[in-house]
């Protein structure tokens, strides 16, 4: 995924996304986890921090400097503190066993390359404390709008009168679960987003996984 693309869309992203994309899921996690040091991987403009702004020490990483500028703007507006670091998910600049918890909402599907995605998840596991949990979401290949697409997709975003394209690797449930197990996570749950009501999970927009480091 091109850093330049996210730098280009950061301002418009901030304007249209003022609330967490999976708000009910994150609010439940804030109740489950209560307090601790939390890492947001691919934090973008920081909306997914909101449910955790009380009781948690917040850290966010993103490889887009412009997104981090919007995160600073967002946290100042909503009056919470987040420690923001420009870094790539495949090489997190933290020591082993630094964080109690982590979230990564719609982040890992932007990483191009099978080995790179595995490396990024290994990095996440490395910086989590033993017993620490992480909530990860990726886009599902089975959602209807992608039925005629390859698993490597370019999804448009309009900014400044032009179209730019974001890279996505579209996961199946089986592929994502297999990858998480390979990295060494214990899967606590894997399911669609809570707003999804269809009885067959395979068509959901998101795959949501709660995992634990042994």
Regions flagged by a language model, labelled:
Residues 118-130:
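A short glycine-rich, Lys/Arg-flanked "PGG" loop and its adjoining helix->strand segment in the class I
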Residues 96, 114-118:
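Conserved strand-to-helix beginnings and helix N-cap segments that scaffold or border functional pockets
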Residues 4, 106, 119:
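Active-site phosphate/pyrophosphate-handling residues
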Residues 90-102:
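A short acidic, Gly/Pro-enriched loop at the edge of an enzyme's catalytic core
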Residues 73-76, 100, 104:
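Short, amphipathic alpha-helix enriched in basic
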Residues 101-115:
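A short SAM/SAH-binding and catalytic strip from SAM-dependent methyltransferases
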Residues 1-35, 39, 44-91, 115, ...:
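Class I (Rossmann-like) S-adenosyl-L-methionine-dependent methyltransferase catalytic domain
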């Amino acid at each position: 995924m091109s850093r330049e693309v996210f730098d280009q869309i950061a301002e418009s992203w901030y304007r249209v996304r003022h609330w967490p994309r999976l708000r009910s899921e994150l609010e439940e996690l804030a109740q489950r986890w209560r307090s601790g040091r939390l890492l947001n991987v691919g934090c973008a403009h920081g909306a997914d921090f909101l449910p955790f702004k009380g009781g948690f020490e917040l850290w966010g990483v993103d490889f887009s400097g412009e997104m981090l500028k919007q995160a600073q703007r967002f946290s100042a507006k909503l009056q919470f503190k987040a420690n923001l670091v420009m870094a790539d998910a495949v090489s997190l600049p933290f020591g082993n066993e630094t964080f109690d918890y982590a979230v990564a909402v719609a982040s890992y599907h932007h990483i191009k390359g099978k080995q790179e995605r595995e490396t990024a998840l290994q990095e996440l596991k490395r910086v989590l404390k033993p017993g620490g949990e992480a909530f990860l979401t990726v886009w599902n290949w089975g959602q209807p709008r992608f039925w005629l697409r390859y698993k490597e997709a370019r999804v448009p975003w309009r900014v400044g009168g032009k179209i730019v394209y974001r890279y996505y690797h579209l996961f199946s449930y089986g592929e994502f679960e297999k990858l998480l197990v390979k990295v060494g996570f214990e899967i606590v749950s894997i399911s669609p987003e809570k707003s999804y009501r269809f009885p067959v999970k395979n068509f959901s927009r998101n795959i949501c996984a709660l995992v634990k480091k042994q």
